[in-house]
Amino acid sequence: MAEVQQLRVQEAVDAMVKSVERENIRKMQGLMFRCSANCCEDNQASMQQVHQCIERCHAPLAQAQALVTSELERFQDRLARCTMHCNDKAKDSMDAGSKELQVKRQLDSCVAKCVDDHMHLIPTMTKKIKESLSSIGK
């Protein structure tokens, strides 16, 4: 049961990441590469100046990647805390003498609720990421 729930979340997050990559990150990569190429075209610039120019070109993309990573980690941490709470409740039930099958059902139900609750957060997280990305480099 838990594997099915994990797969649901993974597929939803993968779809979100692909959407963000296709619609936002890819454009930023193109800008970064074109900007970097322009840095290299400057025959008057020193090696250090070219390097600094390329670093400036890369900064918005690095910021974007850090933002996406941070949001995904925050989401993952929240989901992990929720499922850890389910595990704690299951352990408490076992310690209180509940039957193993009953505890397993309780755990599966709790984990499914965690996943459902967090699946509903993905569209909001996606919107927040895309809005933040659109303001980077402007």
From Swiss-Prot:
Signal peptide: none annotated. The modification Phosphothreonine is found at residues 124, 126. The modification N-acetylalanine is found at residue 2. It holds the Pfam family DUF842. Keywords: Acetylation, Phosphoprotein. GO terms for cellular component: cytoplasm; mitochondrion. Belongs to the FAM136 family. This is Protein FAM136A. It comes from Rattus norvegicus. The lineage of its organism: Eukaryota, Metazoa, Chordata, Craniata, Vertebrata.
